[in-house]
Amino acid sequence: VTATTASAALRGKDYVKPETTQRVRDAARKLGYKINLSGRSLRSGRSDTITFLTSGLEGDYFSHLAMCVAEEVHKRDSHMLIELSRYLTDDNDLSYTFSDGIIAINAPRAVDILKRHPAVMLENYDTSLPVDTVNAPSDAGSRAAIEHLIARGCARIGIVGDNHDPNNPNIIPGSRDIRMRAAKETILAAGLPFDERRDFIKSSWSIDGGIEAGHGLAKKGKCKYDGLYCLNDGIALGILRGLADDGVSVPGDVRVIGFDGLSQSMYSVPTLTTVATDFKGMADTALTLLMRRIENLDDEFFPQTVNVGYKLIERESTAA
């Protein structure tokens, strides 16, 4: 084959016959040939590389989301770099100048960079930012969670995960605020009692925070709530442990539901009912929006905000 055809085959172009592409790739593998990404970038102006920008990968939520984005990037015959915004110094970092675009989550220090590069934000609730956004189904999912508890007969429902900082009242609303508001509205719409000062239960968004909250809720083997909606699965897993430590039965005394759909929820005792975010859909939508901007650099697009879907997975923690 010609050098042009070989190059197209290695780049996965669909106009090359599949059998030709396979022959070229087999030959390249046998010869130990590796694509020079820097050279390709110089010739085409594209590196076929995406930067995933996050403040950190601690916790299963961020690592799972990063894996889903990586899978979608790979499907598009591209590569992904992971950059931690906590180490960000300026916008001349190699990963940004080398990458075609950025997908960012929880990276407030990088806002100026995102404005100057093709970018998509995940879980962004600052409507003043002119950037495409893909969010979790915080509103619809929270309403579904409360409706599920009510359908299971719960009449005194607490919401666990209020980590609001009174010393920082100007913080941009995030998924926490959306989930708390939607849950409260659904409880009140059902004619059930709810007092913000009493029924928004403080907890950091972690298993340890949930354990501490569970200990605080359990009094001599009893809990004043018969249903608890935890704003993420980490909190819910901690709640299960904290309540169990103090002799409160789930679901016998209180039913518990989480949010996210992380894998650990399948293995807790009892197994955790959860609102599972469509992480794959989140990643696919983000890549679709990003590629539209990368492939049309000279075009102007109004920023879009997309909320992905969810699935309520019923398990033992809310069993009838």
Language-model regions, residue ranges each:
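Periplasmic-binding protein-like
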Residues: 51, 98-105, 158-161, 222-232, ...
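Alpha-helical recognition/docking segments in bacterial nutrient-uptake
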Residues: 49-147, 223, 320
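Short beta-strand segments enriched in small/hydrophobic residues
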Residues: 5-8, 43-57, 156-169
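Non-catalytic positions within long, well-ordered alpha-helices that form the structural scaffold/packing
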Residues: 94-95, 150-153, 218
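Flexible loop/turn connectors
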Residues: 215-320
